Amino acid sequence: MSSAKRPIEPLSGGTLVLGALAIGMANFMMVLDTTIANVAVPTISGNLGVAPDQGTWVLTSFSISLAIGLPLTGWLAQRFGQVKLFLSAVVLFVLASVCCGLAPNLTSLLVFRVFQGAVCGPLAPLSQALLVAIFPPARRTTALVVWSMTTFLGPVCGPILGGYLTDNISWPWIFYINVPVGIFILLTLGQVLNGRDNPTRKLPVDVVGLLLLMVAVGSLQILLDKGQDLDWFSAAPIRILAVITVLGFASLITWELTAQHPILDLRLFKERNYAIGTLSVSLGFALYFASLVLVPLWLQTEMGYTATWAGIATAPLGIAGVVLAPFIGRLMQHTDARVLASMAFICWIGASLWRMYFETNLDIQFIGWNSVLMGAGTAFLFTPLVAISLSRLPPEKIPAALGLQNALRMTGASFAVSLGPAFWDHRARQHQVDLAERMTPFDHWSAQAQDNLNNLGLSAQGALESLARTIDRQAHMLALNDFSLASAWLFCAVLAIVWLARSPKAKAK
């Protein structure tokens, strides 16, 4: 073991403020890149000459490589030091962002997005760990609140900033925007944490575990992304991917439970609160993220919104979270964390049930207020569930626990990016068939609609084409209603899971 640097100790005054701001902005930068591209997918797809469903790989590739890179954080931090790793990740992330903006085609963009996701893996867990380290022990709940607020700011700024840059400048600027933020982080932390780091030691890397993780997660992600296009298990490639996925995860779990230095410390799940907290935050965030991707896509492809207006309509998702986050720390002092976590899912259930009644003629204010309620749930998600997860773990296990939890959370988000649009498209096709079957000369509604269109000067063929577009729009609206109902039921299930945890304030026996 070697350590020539001073340990990371609590800061105070202006130094603490600057350090917390820079560390929080690094987490914000990472979260921003998971949401800023959401509203830009249709534009990126069009400019690069690919279909919108192919364009969603811009989101998927980042999320899946991030999920694979996250578990390496614990090993890398012990090998190179938390501060050195953190600053290196920022440098590489900025470099990857520039490369993404310069990408001439979808293939190169996806390669750079994979690189971007992999190198920013340490930012989320290390931003948590460093914030906890620089705050005095009595104010460590404040550190988690700061981290949560920067996480909420991503959904607030991402859609608006992404929409504005896409509509008014060009889509590469959604990546170039990371450059000044990264420079500020490097300059600030280079001064605030100069000469400070944790002790380092050489550890063998779990190469087998890493390869199994890449195979298992990668094959599952490809299966989910391509399943809809290939008609799922009727296609041989999907069946082969399913077998690889099952064998990959079975081998990964078996290996990691017996490895001396596992890349994923699955033994952490023996602690009940950690298992329940991690499962709850992963499932909850996945469902939330699916909505975060699907609603802007619906607004642009079916409702005629520009990227900017789609961003404005969904930006309130994070406003309530930012406003409520400072109060969560105070509530945590005298309220059961399970109660606060339950509030997240209650808000999401209410917002999902409300969204079931969306229609194609609703205005942007209606969508915005629904987003406020959806966003309020985010304020109650992270801090209580992280507190539940870590409440019974020894301090030396916390970095690995945070890395694994963030990995599973982002893996769930990447799966949601694939499954959400696939479910939406599948239900839309079913509704299209049902609605089209009613378009007969004997159906009063279709006959009257066609007569009205003919009276407006449309030919018979033009009237039929107009009705077909209306059916397509209504089918996708009904499909979004179906997605909202399914989300509400799943949120109810996760709400029940939260209460299987022990109260963090109860003493461990």
Where are these regions (language model features)?
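C-terminal membrane-cytosol helix-exit motif in multi-pass small-molecule transporters
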Residues: P180-N198, M214-K226, I244-T258, L495-R502
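Hydrophobic transmembrane architecture of multi-pass small-molecule transporters
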Residues: S2, E9, F184, L404, ...
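Cytoplasmic loop-to-transmembrane helix junctions
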Residues: Q54, R139-V146, K397-L404
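Small-residue-rich alpha-helical segments with characteristic i,i+4
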Residues: P155-P159, S291, I367-S446
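Helix-loop-helix hairpins in multi-pass membrane proteins, especially solute transporters
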Residues: L70-G209, A235
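Hydrophobic/small/kink-forming positions within alpha-helical transmembrane segments
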Residues: A67-I68, V98, F152, V156, ...
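Transmembrane core module of solute transporters
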Residues: G14-Q78, V83-F86, T107-L110, S170, ...
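Transmembrane alpha-helical cores of Major Facilitator Superfamily
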Residues: F28, T60-I64, V91, V145-M149, ...
